[in-house]
């Protein structure tokens, strides 16, 4: 009998998976890296976000790439560790809470990023082929429009639909929920896109 088929231990193990996921997700790599590089508080420039796109507005491409990678790995690590310890359902819980940890980190007064990199990392751990599809959609849209936010929003619209068609259903449910939350976190970006005032990739300020 696996740990999560035992009704006496499953709630505690799922709670532990959630805690591990949240703590991993809440590490603010964008803020840490920019401070270590002597660039100050990334929350005081551009969109005020702690993610890779805003780090790119410092002009340091390597730092932005490192932020993207480390933020994504938070989601991947949460999914893979929980899956190895407690199985599939626990991995989805850990991935979800890693995403929430990035969006609402306790260390920063629950004001974090918008979750795109962690979303990618969760996909890498839970549905690797869908992560590749996400990357292709993002890259194609970004190449055409130069809008990071639009690229992510489009990918987060398409990937859940693909998962509902191809399965598995529980992963589709998780990714749909992540997409809805991230779309909500991007509401100001959506307003700026509609107004034609959204910053393009590489644009400072």
Swiss-Prot record:
It is found in: Cell inner membrane. Keywords: Cell inner membrane, Cell membrane, Lipid biosynthesis, Lipid metabolism, Membrane, Phospholipid biosynthesis, Phospholipid metabolism, Transferase, Transmembrane, Transmembrane helix. Pathway: Lipid metabolism; phospholipid metabolism. Its EC number is 2.3.1.275. The chain crosses the membrane at residues 13-33, 68-88, 90-110, 120-140, 147-167. It catalyses: an acyl phosphate + sn-glycerol 3-phosphate = a 1-acyl-sn-glycero-3-phosphate + phosphate. GO terms for cellular component: plasma membrane. One of its GO terms (molecular function) is acyl-phosphate glycerol-3-phosphate acyltransferase activity. Pfam families: G3P_acyltransf. The keyword Mitochondrion does not apply. It is an enzyme of class 2 (transferase). PANTHER family: GLYCEROL-3-PHOSPHATE ACYLTRANSFERASE-RELATED, INNER MEMBRANE PROTEIN YGIH. Belongs to the PlsY family. Catalyzes the transfer of an acyl group from acyl-phosphate (acyl-PO(4)) to glycerol-3-phosphate (G3P) to form lysophosphatidic acid (LPA). This enzyme utilizes acyl-phosphate as fatty acyl donor, but not acyl-CoA or acyl-ACP. This is Glycerol-3-phosphate acyltransferase. It comes from Agrobacterium fabrum (strain C58 / ATCC 33970) (Agrobacterium tumefaciens (strain C58)).
């Amino acid at each position: 009998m696996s740990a999560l088929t035992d009704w006496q231990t499953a709630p505690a193990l799922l709670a532990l998976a959630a805690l591990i996921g949240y703590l991993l997700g809440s590490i603010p790599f964008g803020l840490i890296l920019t401070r270590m590089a002597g660039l100050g508080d990334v929350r005081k420039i551009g969109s005020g976000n702690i993610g890779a796109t805003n780090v790119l507005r410092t002009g340091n491409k390597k730092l932005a790439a490192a932020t993207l990678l480390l933020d994504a790995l938070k989601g991947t690590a949460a999914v893979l560790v929980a899956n190895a310890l407690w199985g599939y359902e626990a991995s989805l819980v850990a991935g979800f809470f890693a995403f929430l940890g990035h969006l609402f980190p306790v260390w920063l007064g629950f004001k974090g990023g918008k979750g795109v990199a962690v979303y990618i990392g969760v996909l890498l751990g839970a549905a690797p082929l869908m992560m590749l599809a996400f990357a292709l959609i993002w890259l194609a849209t970004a190449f055409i429009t130069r809008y990071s936010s639009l690229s992510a929003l489009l990918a987060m619209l398409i990937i859940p639909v693909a998962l509902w068609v191809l399965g598995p259903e529980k992963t589709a449910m998780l990714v749909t929920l992540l997409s809805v939350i991230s779309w909500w976190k991007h509401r100001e970006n959506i307003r700026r896109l509609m107004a034609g005032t959204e910053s393009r990739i590489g644009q400072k300020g």
